[in-house]
Amino acid sequence: MDNQSGIVMYSTQWCGDCVRSKKVFDKLNIKFTEIDIDFDKDAYEIAKKLQNQNPRIPTIVFEDGSYLVEPSDVELIDKLNSL
């Protein structure tokens, strides 16, 4: 699997699931952009829109427009392997 670009993870500093997902990206050497929705109002609004006005984190958006919300490690790895 090549390093992916165009992957965006909406997160916060206090989110344990976000830390876990970042470890998956690091372990697989996958590049991604992390945006903290506590500090970026526009990013918060994007996450909110994707989830019917109730944003949950992490929300991970892929280049093809698909996204995962609070994925397990297995779900995230499966998605990354399918890219």
Give names to the regions the model predicted.
Residues 62-83:
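Non-catalytic, surface beta->alpha helical segment in thiol-disulfide oxidoreductase systems
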Residues 31:
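Residue-level detector of anion-binding/catalytic polar loops
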Residues 1-28:
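Local sequence-structure signature of Cys/Sec-based thiol-disulfide redox active-site neighborhoods
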